[in-house]
């Protein structure tokens, strides 16, 4: 699917977010690439979430498994509850080798307050 995006002249995360942040942009990308709008929305939310310092792909996968799929969802979470949920999930699913500390999870939540949310549903 990366090839499809490149053919549509989407070669960077920044460009992708500029286009895929809006419903109309996703519709255009869907038309040009054949990638579904829900999938593009999911990717856009993930890319926006990964703007948070020290929150890479593996931790984003773990957050998603814990029910956090966007910056706005992360903002509303209680750090202790989220960390506990992430631990339980990771014990079963082994998504990350090293669990983030409660301090790091709290910092993600704090840092999420500073992210300008551009992705609309």
Descriptions of predicted regions:
Residues 1-121:
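C-terminal extensions
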């Amino acid at each position: 699917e990366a090839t499809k995006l490149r053919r549509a002249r989407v070669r960077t995360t920044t460009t992708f977010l500029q286009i895929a942040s809006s419903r109309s942009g996703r519709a255009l990308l869907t038309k040009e690439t054949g990638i579904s709008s829900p999938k593009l929305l999911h990717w856009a939310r993930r890319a926006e979430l990964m703007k948070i310092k020290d929150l890479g792909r593996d931790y984003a996968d773990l957050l998603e498994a814990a029910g956090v799929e966007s910056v706005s969802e992360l903002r509303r979470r209680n750090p202790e509850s989220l960390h506990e949920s992430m631990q339980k999930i990771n014990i079963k699913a082994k998504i990350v080798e090293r669990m983030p500390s409660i301090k790091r999870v709290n910092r993600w939540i704090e840092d999420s307050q500073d992210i300008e949310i551009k992705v609309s549903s």
